[in-house]
Amino acid sequence: MKNCIFTLLISIVLFSCKNEGCTDPLAINFDDSSNKNDGSCEYLYNLDIRFSLNDNDTKLVKNDIISFENNSFRIEKFKLFFSEISVANSTNTENISEVFLYNLENENTYNITASISQNNFTEFNFGIGLNETQNSTTPADYETDHPLGIDNDTHWTMSNSNSYIFALIEGKLDTIGDGSFFNRTYHLAHNDLLRNVSLQKDIIFNDQLNETIEITIELKEIFEGIDLSATIPHQSDNSPLAHQIMDNINNAFEVQ
């Protein structure tokens, strides 16, 4: 009888002792020895950022044609560098990626994923192009499949300097509507062409650990105010036209 009472007392003591900690197996600080949740659980939230080149609500692919201001443009190549990608709220900034290359011809570059520790943010920030440190490197400094590697064919060796092509747009243009297309190429490469973009978007993960945001690039807006019929050389220097196009790209983003 005494043994039974002793066993009962031990059981009561054991069950009355609460080991507080994180009891959620989904948390990164889950403690399987805890039997009472103390609200200390910490999580990694999965963010999927998807990019698309658009004509209004239509996502474009290679050889699609857009029409605007009596012009028709067939898009054949579109590459755009993003740098220092981050998300932020009023108190914290969290880095996503140092460099990312969107390539219309490669579906594997249509999105970037990241795990972040904050469960809400209000801004999505990035540079269009590369910072001076990144732009001073060469493909030989990277693995071949790195965004800055040789496989992506975005490095330009010029007579006076070397540079990555921040924005590459190639296609065919019809300015008179008779179906006769001629080549139109923009290769924008210069340190001064870097633009910083901040998109406002309230994202709250709530109880879910996964969230997706869509960032669109409106192709028509890139050509806003540009004389497409003019003869335009490769933009290997700091030209007014190059700045105008980069400014237009800066204004062509929308986050959904």
Predicted regions and their residues:
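N-terminal functional modules and adjacent low-complexity/disordered segments of proteins
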Residues: 7-10, 25, 75, 218
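Low-complexity, intrinsically disordered/propeptide-like segments
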Residues: 9-12, 208
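A short, solvent-exposed, low-complexity linear motif enriched for acidic/polar residues
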Residues: 44-256
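Primarily marks secretory-pathway-exposed extracellular/lumenal segments that are disulfide-
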Residues: 4-6, 13-43
